[in-house]
Amino acid sequence: ADGGISNGSVSLAPRKSELYTTPPQEPTDSWLEHLCVHEFRHVIQFDKVNQGLTKGLSYLFGEIFPIAVFGVYLPMWFVEGDAVTFETSVGHLGRGRSPEFLNEMKAQIVEKGLYSFHKAVLGSNKDYVPNRYNMGYYMVSNTRHHYGSDIWSKAIERSGRRPYGINPFDKSLTLSIGNRRDSLWNTSSFRALFHNPDSVKKANYFYNTKRMLYRDNYSELQQIWKREAANCTHTFDTVPTHNKYYTNYYYPTALGKDTVLAYKMGLQETGSFVMLTHGKEKRITRTGLLYDYKFATDRKRIVWSEYRSHLRWEQAGKMRISSYDIKRKKYTRLRGRNNQFSPFKAGDKWGYVETDRQNRSYLVLTDSTLKHELWRMEAEDNEQFIHPSYHNGKILTVVQAPAGIRLESIDITTHNREKITQDIYYELDNPQPTDTNIIYRASYNGNNALYSLQNGTHKKILDSKFGLRFPSFDSEENRLYFSFYTSDGYKPGTATPQQLTSEAVDYTTYPLADEMAKQEQWQQTFTYDSVFPTRCYNKLTHLVNLHSWAPIYASLSPMEVDLGATIYSQNKLSTLTFTAGYVRQSGYKHGNWLLNLTYSGWWPILSVEFESGREDFQSFADGLNLQTGQKDALYVFNKSQRSSADFVIQFPFNLSSRQYNSSLRPYLRYQIEGIHHQRPKQVYGYELQENTAILYPVQKQDYHIYQANRYYQLMEYGLTYSNQTRMTEQEINPRWGQMLTGGFT
């Protein structure tokens, strides 16, 4: 998919991978290679599970059984932590070498201590808890560091080979560790981390090995990180903010004397631009979804890039340059066919990065109204422009290339490109040119720090315990603004030139990542030496993809499980899904045939639900006595079929914009249900004597019984409309919303 989202996923039922190929504005390895390596690791995990008894039972249940074992036994922090470890160990960068990724756990552990294992795994709406990727990376890699590279592989294999018992995954960890935990805690270097190592070891012990590893790993890392934090002595000023819960302030930028503009997002804020003045905060406007928080301003207007949903297709939305006139309070959005990122001010013009469907990257300049394109430059093959800025007729930008990441200066008039730094496998972004130097963020020292480049010499000028980013230099005040990370989020900071240092650059490695690379013994090198045949994808011939079958029927809507025999199909594009079979379903005493089918490949969504089964019922009927020629009243026990069909056509429209999630869904529904193929099993004569019903047996072959087929039809027209504000982590209900439903039956 070439929409505005940069992501990927792998599923096992059905077995497929989905890659969202638009590269993000993050300096990392080549996006497609990074994405494929991470997602392919999940494929390997699935294959590791699908062996032994699990593989045997997959012949009985199809692909649904391995994914059930996978979901029940493998914790998600391991699944994602292992994939992050692999992407880091075989890549040049990866998240295991990204301070932005690493510092979330560091800040929480150092400043707030260790949360309980359950809180770390399940998360919290009260406190910010780093996600399963962050927590899982340290769990997987640090455990491998102490207990060997195969400890997790054995756990997956045991879960697949023996998917019985309470927890084979945890049992395998227990067997793999054995007495080695005692050996680890007896080493002098490990004991030296703690004041009383024996008491810590005892407190960390749990019968659940995963829980024990969590305590051991993070107790060790806590001591290491505390010492690292104590060695950071840089000082700077903070811009006062007041928040009870976790809140981030991105890209603080001077908006006049004593006024700072920043993008705010947190547990109680979905995303908005705010002005900070003397400790007071004023919201300017809320925004839609931002995946990169970089914005630009000329102090009259704010320009940023936000996600614009497609009217119909979920993955076809684009990143669009949007602007807000502060004085007129007017919101506008730039149109275009491609994704637009990282706006910047270029004199009296505006600029941004554009990425097309082939992942070609462009620098674009427009006039002051953002309506007319004036200048465009295309990057070389496999290059991406990241976080450009402008100074004195030149665009300064980060360039991500296969050989590494570098800074470049591009002359607007001549289109001449000049390398300012050599290609290097460290993160670089947000270059801010001044009259005398270039200030940028880099990960040279294993942390997010600010550096200065002047006359070809790099110097570290500012650092903090858990990193700082998003520099912005105000030439009028001669002051540097930035965001520094804490366990309560990114906070705005500021420094004068006198507070900045001038330290030599220390190119630090990442010990844990390097150790994992040694264990893998493979460096990511892609050689394009083969050409594989391609052919057009035929949607018709690939419409059906049977992936699972089972002697049970399981439905999520409504939630029910019944015995039976069913097959499940979902094609690779997820346009056609259906479940078919014969099940012992509620409402049918003798079982019934069913078919639930949905086709989503066109704008309208077509749904069909069909059920048919035996229906026994009793009824009064008139019968012609073939011997006497009289019409008699009868009471009949019938054997018949009850069938129902429900056809629905929906026309979904996604009207979401800015801070509102909105949808409109007109629909047409036709339903028919009836009782047919009625056959009398037993027939009784019927008489009333003194208000008492008397039934007496008769021979059904003596009567011609009049019974019409029983059925009803329903035609329904209607629409549903929903509109509500996006919700924060802590909100139970939206701040504002409407739900309207109307129809005619």
What are these regions, as identified by a protein language model?
Residues A1-V69, P75:
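Juxtacatalytic substrate-recognition/specificity segment
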Residues H234, T238, N243-T247, A442, ...:
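Outer-membrane beta-barrel initiation region
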